[in-house]
């Protein structure tokens, strides 16, 4: 595995020398089997907004929660909610008229107070000794997710329980926005391409794939960075150029792109996915051993 690029939410890395089945298994695990925390139950005490209770609950469930799932245990239907298996949030907000608004104003931002309900209004309510033991400030990943809009007198008062789950059970538990891979492009120039043809060849590929260099006073094309190519196949529209280039892919070189929802850093997601895959392999070997003993 070679790390290519990483920032707060995205990671690009290469996996070399593996089979397509392993690469796809790894992608599917990232999408559906790395656990996260998400809103599972919503207790509606008061909701006089235009948003129906079930729609409100659905919107709350899809808000990514910044909480490390490794700190929690899975909760079954029979288990009671406690500090080990549940995170609790409260959303209580009421819209009112602004007394400072100008009489001729028509801007809701000036006329009303709390007329837009955002994810930042969700407050963590610690259960048991969570505040002391976990040393964390659990919150929504993004503060600016719009949940509902209110008018004076309307109110939302709900209590939310977040539990640990995986994307296989519900998409709200998926820790990634996208997880994909592609084979490394392989571009070979079958013969020298010079002059005006070299310039046109460069325009047939993504920026940075083909570069022009001066050799003995002539412009000559060369492959600079094949991994930047998006396989647009533009080259095949040019009859005089298409036979000068061979396009292929390296069959055991996979370029992975992972974009986190922000719940966990992308490098942590990759390491957790590897652990899940190793656990699956170990369970399979144990099953084989048990069959052989029989």
Kindly label every feature range from the protein language model.
Residues 1-294:
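Protein-protein interaction/assembly regions in multi-subunit complexes
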């Amino acid at each position: 595995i070679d790390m290519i690029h990483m920032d707060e939410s995205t990671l690009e890395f290469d996996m070399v020398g593996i089979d397509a089945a392993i690469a796809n298994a790894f992608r599917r695990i990232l999408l559906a089997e790395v656990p996260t925390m998400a809103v599972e139950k919503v207790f509606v005490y008061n909701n006089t907004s235009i948003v129906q209770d079930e729609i409100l609950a659905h919107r709350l469930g899809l808000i990514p929660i910044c909480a490390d799932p490794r700190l929690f245990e899975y909760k079954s239907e029979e288990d009671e909610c406690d500090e080990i298996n549940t995170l609790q949030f409260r959303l209580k907000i009421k819209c009112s008229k602004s007394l400072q608004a100008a009489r001729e104003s028509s801007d809701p931002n000036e006329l009303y107070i709390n007329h837009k309900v955002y994810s930042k209004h969700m407050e963590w309510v610690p259960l048991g000794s969570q505040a002391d033991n976990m040393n964390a400030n659990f919150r929504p990943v993004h503060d600016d997710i719009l949940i509902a809009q209110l008018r004076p007198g309307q109110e939302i008062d709900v209590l939310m329980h977040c539990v640990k789950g995986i994307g296989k059970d519900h998409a709200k538990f998926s820790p990634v926005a996208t997880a994909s891979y592609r084979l490394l492009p392989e571009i070979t120039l079958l013969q020298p391409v010079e002059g005006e043809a070299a310039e046109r060849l460069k325009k047939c590929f993504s920026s940075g794939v083909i570069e022009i260099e001066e050799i003995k006073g002539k412009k000559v094309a060369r492959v600079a960075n094949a991994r930047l190519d998006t396989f647009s196949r533009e080259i095949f529209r040019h009859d005089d150029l298409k036979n000068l280039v061979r396009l292929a892919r390296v069959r055991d070189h996979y370029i992975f792109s992972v974009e986190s929802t922000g719940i966990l850093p992308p490098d942590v997601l990759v390491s957790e996915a590897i652990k899940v895959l190793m656990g699956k392999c170990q369970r399979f070997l144990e099953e084989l051993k048990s069959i052989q003993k029989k």
